[in-house]
């Protein structure tokens, strides 16, 4: 998984299940409009948070280079590429084939005042017939109902500023717009910042 210890399954609202290996967060979009309203996000305007300073835009071919550069940074590489260079190449293959083989994944570049500072994505779990059952212990029988998310902040000076929380809110808003009902995420237990970010966005422990 993009964010990949001891496993806990989190559901919204306030349901806790114990599992085996990884922290696995599940956000169920039940009463989602109420949650979004409280969080200050409009699903119809999910890009308009924080005075329009933080935006997400679809990844383009010319963005692959900066994404590759971010993946090579140690603090990102250890989470996104736990299997080393093979894993990095798999990421690059994914974004390069995002309109064909990986059409069910939506990749974005995150901008702060028009400066590219990060990356995020969501994927429709319906199309992952092996990974989702093996990793989350569930099957998905309908398109556009269950999604997985991931994100990174590629520029160090933007770490620790609450931008990850904004990114997750935007992804939740995007998924809600297309009728998603459940969102999955799988941060490593050592990735404390990502865990806090998910919890602060309604993935409740």
Segment roles from a protein language model:
Residues 124-148, 159:
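Conserved acyl-donor/pantetheine-binding loop and adjacent beta-alpha core of acyl/acetyltransferases
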Residues 109, 115-124, 148:
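Conserved beta-strand in the GNAT
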Residues 158, 162-170:
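Conserved acetyl-CoA pyrophosphate-binding loop and the N-cap/start of the following alpha-helix
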Residues 150-159, 188:
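A short, internal acetyl-CoA/4′-phosphopantetheine-binding micro-motif in the GNAT/acyltransferase core
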Residues 165-166, 189-205:
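Conserved active-site alpha-helix within GNAT-family acetyltransferase domains
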Residues 54-69:
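A short beta-loop-alpha structural element at the N-terminal edge
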Residues 177-187:
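Conserved GNAT acetyl-CoA-binding A-motif
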Residues 75-96:
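Conserved GNAT-fold acetyl-CoA-binding loop/helix
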């Amino acid at each position: 998984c993009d964010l990949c210890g001891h496993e806990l399954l989190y559901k919204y609202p306030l349901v806790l299940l114990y599992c085996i290996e990884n922290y696995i967060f599940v956000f169920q979009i039940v009463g989602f409009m109420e949650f979004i309203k409280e969080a200050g996000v409009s699903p119809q305007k999910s890009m308009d948070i924080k005075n329009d300073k933080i935006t997400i835009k679809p990844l383009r071919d010319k963005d692959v280079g900066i994404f590759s550069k971010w993946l090579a940074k140690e603090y990102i590489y250890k989470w996104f590429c736990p299997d080393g260079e093979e894993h990095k190449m798999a990421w690059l293959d994914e974004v390069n084939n995002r309109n064909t083989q990986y059409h069910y994944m939506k990749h974005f570049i995150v901008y702060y005042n028009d400066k590219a500072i990060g990356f995020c994505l969501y994927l429709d779990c319906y199309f992952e017939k092996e990974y989702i059952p093996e990793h989350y212990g569930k099957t998905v029988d309908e398109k556009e109902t269950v999604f997985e998310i991931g994100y990174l902040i590629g520029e160090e000076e933007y770490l620790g500023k609450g931008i990850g929380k904004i990114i997750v809110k935007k992804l939740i808003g995007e998924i809600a717009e297309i009728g998603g009902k459940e969102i999955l995420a799988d941060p490593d237990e050592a990735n404390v910042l990502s865990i806090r970010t998910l919890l602060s966005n309604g993935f409740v422990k």
